[in-house]
């Protein structure tokens, strides 16, 4: 801090102008026990060794997210491993995208206008979410909250683009509808490009490498314009619809997991929505089939005809029912429970 003040006063005195517009002062990097790193304690960490083992990007990611602005941070190797795993996730997601870009004829004239009519609810949702994250990250960067901005970019990349959108889009990529496939590829590459640019200041090496394989761009990412918010990409209604569908899928998955139902076992899902939630559920039928192991999705106006033993899940304005006889093999379940009872009795 002292040298900053000294330089500022010297520049004002000698040149009558500020030496720099902004100064960002960060805390110390301490060891995992909170001690200052020193030769006498022997607790110093050689960054070159970490880079050799995990890569420079993993170290940069760790240092950027390890603390809140202005505070000291504790250095944990587990956080470097966590960062390395994220970089691997980004690399594998990008490889998946590139594997589906091998048919160059699908990329001819691939623009928003050319695929607009074939964009699905999921496409619009991920484009809108990417746009919103871009806005938030830009704000955090302007406020010098670099760690918060990186965390938001990380959460979006891992939890929404990789875990949800890529899984949602697979049936279209593997299908035979050419225009549906083009719309999916456009969305995949459009959002991936934004992700790479958002992450580039933090993990420059892997993002530059991945960017070089994108057939939809030219030049280097380091000279590309940083993403900015675009009002045309803001689709809040689609986000709300998709969030409701995803919430329903999560709850169905939780029910199946609690009952030890394998993903390979399909089961019918009956949905009873309120009038305002019905359009979202209609749009989400295929997503329930592919992501919630539904053999059939039936949307009803009332609970009439639903089996009494059906397992139910309630979310915002929507009730979901799964007939128990489609989930459970009663004889096997009875056998399992009897074994657990016998084991418990033997331990008494």
State each model region's role.
Residues 1:
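Mg2+/Mn2+-dependent nuclease catalytic core
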Residues 69-71:
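Transmembrane helix-loop junctions at the membrane interface of multipass transporters and ion channels
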